[in-house]
């Protein structure tokens, strides 16, 4: 077996590397070239919104394409640029805006992986006769430990927990996992940068890309209001107890769990508890009203060894991660008449619809990724949940 788990020599193995123009994917290309693989680099032109083309830390725009080209020249490998701007807008940017005006907190990086990188780009790699598509994600994959799943691969958290990107890859299907390779899974970020320096790559000291590449300066409201002008319609700011505390200029300016910049002063610390998109109300309350014990999932991608219905029916003990910055915490996947849900043993504050809930076998670097889903709705502690439901059923002021 070669280093990518193929039963042939590296020179007889063609690999397409998804090159963003950053240090991680550049090092992947360099490592594979060094090992003797037949390497092709592909960069996707995903968007162009003026200043971001040359903004430090942007991704998949003009400067990044040029950086990827220069890296490929240094390594002596072919480089191709594919224009996926229309596809990216259709499957990532527009749904992002729709999700925001629906009161959700979307994760466009997951959608990009699902619909562009691991779908369209993967198909292109196959058309080019590649045996695998390699990326610079910090995650690991290896052959499945179960004999009956021979030929399949499983996902695991990486060695560098601080760079763990498994949360954004929970939706990767089994077919995609079997074709993908992640050469950085056993490396730390400092080791990756050291390799880039050693290889003489121009991107060795380049800043890391931001999570949401198409949002200038991180202002979600700017792009949402541009795509959906009605999203800026105002409404009420309402306390969980029913008091109208003030008004706002659009729910797109708020997120669940937000405390600063709410726009009302009552002498008590208040947090955004819920965004009522239908009535354009921002519902606020005390911190304890954010505590969530149960989340219902949609679009579940299950990577476990048994059927999901069987696992959920009996209760599947696991660890769940509802934020990219959190460590996996004890949980149990179950189901009822309303669908698949996850019980968070220790609870979690500020869980919002649209976020991902990734599932794991544990918390360490050997933890297997069981997949996960998008949070459809969450349930709070009984008192807060009852107050919220009563408020949602009451008509908003005209």
From Swiss-Prot:
Residue intervals passing through the bilayer: none
A GO molecular-function descriptor: tRNA-uridine 2-sulfurtransferase activity
A GO cellular component entry from the record: cytoplasm
UniProt entry tagged with the keyword RNA-binding: yes
Active site: 112, 213
Location relative to the cell: Cytoplasm
Start and end residues of each stretch annotated as Interaction with tRNA: 163-165
Residues with site note (Interaction with tRNA): 137, 355
Disulfide bonding pattern of the chain: 112-213
EC class name: transferase
Positions contributing to ATP binding: 18-25, 44, 136
GO BP term, pick one: tRNA wobble position uridine thiolation
Keywords linked to the UniProt accession: ATP-binding, Cytoplasm, Disulfide bond, Nucleotide-binding, RNA-binding, Transferase, tRNA processing, tRNA-binding
Gene3D superfamilies the record matches: Adenine nucleotide alpha hydrolases-like domains (2.30.30.280), HUPs (3.40.50.620), Translation factors (2.40.30.10)
InterPro entries in alphabetical order: MnmA-like (IPR004506), MnmA-like_C (IPR046885), MnmA-like_central (IPR046884), MnmA-like_central_sf (IPR023382), Rossmann-like_a/b/a_fold (IPR014729)
NCBIfam families tied to this protein: PRK00143.1, trmU
Family to which the UniProt record says this protein belongs: Belongs to the MnmA/TRMU family.
Function summary: Catalyzes the 2-thiolation of uridine at the wobble position (U34) of tRNA, leading to the formation of s(2)U34.
Protein name: tRNA-specific 2-thiouridylase MnmA
Lineage, opening ranks: Bacteria, Pseudomonadati, Pseudomonadota, Alphaproteobacteria, Hyphomicrobiales
């Amino acid at each position: 077996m070669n280093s990518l788990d193929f039963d042939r020599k590296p020179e007889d193995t063609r690999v397409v590397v998804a090159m963003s123009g950053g240090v991680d994917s550049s090092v992947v290309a360099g490592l594979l070239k060094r090992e003797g693989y037949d390497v092709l680099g592909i960069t996707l032109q995903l968007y162009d919104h003026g200043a971001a083309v040359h903004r430090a830390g942007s991704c998949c725009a003009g400067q990044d394409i040029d950086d990827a080209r220069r890296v490929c020249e240094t390594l002596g490998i072919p480089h191709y640029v594919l224009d996926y701007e229309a596809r990216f807008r259709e499957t990532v940017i527009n749904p992002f805006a729709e999700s925001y005006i629906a009161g959700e907190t979307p994760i466009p990086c997951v959608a990009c992986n699902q619909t562009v990188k691991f779908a369209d780009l993967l198909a292109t790699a196959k058309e080019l006769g590649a045996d695998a598509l390699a990326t610079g994600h910090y995650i690991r994959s290896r052959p499945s430990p179960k004999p009956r799943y021979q030929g399949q691969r499983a996902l695991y958290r990486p060695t560098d927990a601080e760079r763990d990107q498994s949360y954004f890859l929970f939706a990767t299907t089994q077919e995609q996992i079997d074709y993908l390779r992640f050469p950085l899974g056993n490396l730390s970020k400092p080791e990756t940068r050291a390799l880039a320096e050693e290889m003489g790559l121009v991107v060795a000291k380049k800043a890391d890309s931001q999570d949401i590449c198409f949002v200038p300066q991180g202002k979600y409201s700017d792009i949402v209001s541009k795509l959906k002008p009605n999203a800026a319609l105002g409404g009420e700011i309402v306390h969980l107890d029913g008091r109208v505390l003030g008004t706002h200029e659009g729910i797109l300016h708020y997120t669940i769990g937000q405390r600063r910049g709410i726009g009302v002063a009552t002498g008590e610390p208040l947090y955004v508890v819920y965004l009522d998109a239908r009535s354009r109300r921002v519902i606020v309350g005390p911190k304890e009203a954010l505590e969530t014990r149960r989340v219902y999932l949609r679009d579940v991608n299950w990577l476990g060894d048994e059927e999901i219905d069987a696992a959920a029916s009996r209760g599947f003990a696991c660890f769940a991660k509802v934020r990219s910055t959190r460590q996996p915490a004890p949980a149990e996947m179950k189901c009822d008449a309303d669908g698949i849900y996850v019980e968070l043993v220790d609870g979690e504050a500020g869980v919002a619809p649209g976020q991902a809930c990734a599932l794991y076998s544990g918390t360490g670097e050997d933890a297997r990724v069981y997949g996960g889903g998008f949070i459809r709705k969450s349930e709070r502690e009984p008192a807060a949940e009852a107050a919220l439901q009563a408020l949602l059923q009451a008509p908003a002021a005209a």
